[in-house]
UniProtKB/Swiss-Prot annotation:
<keyword id="KW-0689">Ribosomal protein</keyword>
<keyword id="KW-0687">Ribonucleoprotein</keyword>
<feature type="binding site">
    <location>
        <position position="77"/>
    </location>
    <ligand>
        <name>Zn(2+)</name>
    </ligand>
</feature>
<dbReference type="GO" id="GO:0022625">
    <property type="term" value="C:cytosolic large ribosomal subunit"/>
</dbReference>
<feature type="binding site">
    <location>
        <position position="17"/>
    </location>
    <ligand>
        <name>Zn(2+)</name>
    </ligand>
</feature>
<dbReference type="InterPro" id="IPR011332">
    <property type="entry name" value="Ribosomal_zn-bd"/>
</dbReference>
<keyword id="KW-0862">Zinc</keyword>
<protein>
    <recommendedName>
        <fullName>Large ribosomal subunit protein eL42</fullName>
    </recommendedName>
</protein>
<dbReference type="GO" id="GO:0003735">
    <property type="term" value="F:structural constituent of ribosome"/>
</dbReference>
<dbReference type="InterPro" id="IPR053708">
    <property type="entry name" value="Ribosomal_LSU_eL42"/>
</dbReference>
<keyword id="KW-0963">Cytoplasm</keyword>
<feature type="binding site">
    <location>
        <position position="12"/>
    </location>
    <ligand>
        <name>Zn(2+)</name>
    </ligand>
</feature>
<comment type="similarity">
    <text>Belongs to the eukaryotic ribosomal protein eL42 family.</text>
</comment>
<feature type="binding site">
    <location>
        <position position="74"/>
    </location>
    <ligand>
        <name>Zn(2+)</name>
    </ligand>
</feature>
<dbReference type="Pfam" id="PF00935">
    <property type="entry name" value="Ribosomal_L44"/>
</dbReference>
<comment type="subunit">
    <text>Component of the large ribosomal subunit. Mature ribosomes consist of a small (40S) and a large (60S) subunit. The 40S subunit contains about 32 different proteins and 1 molecule of RNA (18S). The 60S subunit contains 45 different proteins and 3 molecules of RNA (25S, 5.8S and 5S).</text>
</comment>
<comment type="function">
    <text>Component of the ribosome, a large ribonucleoprotein complex responsible for the synthesis of proteins in the cell. The small ribosomal subunit (SSU) binds messenger RNAs (mRNAs) and translates the encoded message by selecting cognate aminoacyl-transfer RNA (tRNA) molecules. The large subunit (LSU) contains the ribosomal catalytic site termed the peptidyl transferase center (PTC), which catalyzes the formation of peptide bonds, thereby polymerizing the amino acids delivered by tRNAs into a polypeptide chain.</text>
</comment>
């Protein structure tokens, strides 16, 4: 279980800052895939008409987790940076801090 606070003081690469400032932390999420990307246009053109599936669909998935990517936004200049963490099964943003002798809860 990885628990990350919602704010973090870290170095900002922005042109105005270039020093340690407070950052707002969020979890990165991939955007919606565009219908007009060249690969998608080519794939749709190939798929249309008769002939079934034209490209193989990947089935041999090996990984059970994804790497968590943090999106850090500077509260001063609004510059955004991304910070990848290690793989983990349970990720929590701004959860309660651990107490001594307490059982883990998911």
């Amino acid at each position: 279980m990885v628990n990350v606070p919602k704010t973090r003081k870290t170095y900002c690469k922005g042109k105005e800052c270039r020093k340690h400032t407070q950052h707002k932390v969020t979890q990165y999420k991939a955007g919606k895939a565009s219908l007009f990307a060249q690969g998608k246009r080519r794939y749709d053109r190939k798929q249309s008409g008769y002939g079934g599936q034209t490209k193989q669909i990947f089935h041999k998935k090996a990984k059970t987790t994804k790497k968590v990517v943090l999106r850090l936004e500077c509260v001063v200049c609004k510059t955004k940076a991304q910070l990848p963490l290690k793989r983990c099964k349970h990720f929590e943003l701004g959860g309660d801090k651990k107490q001594k002798g307490q059982a883990l809860q998911f």
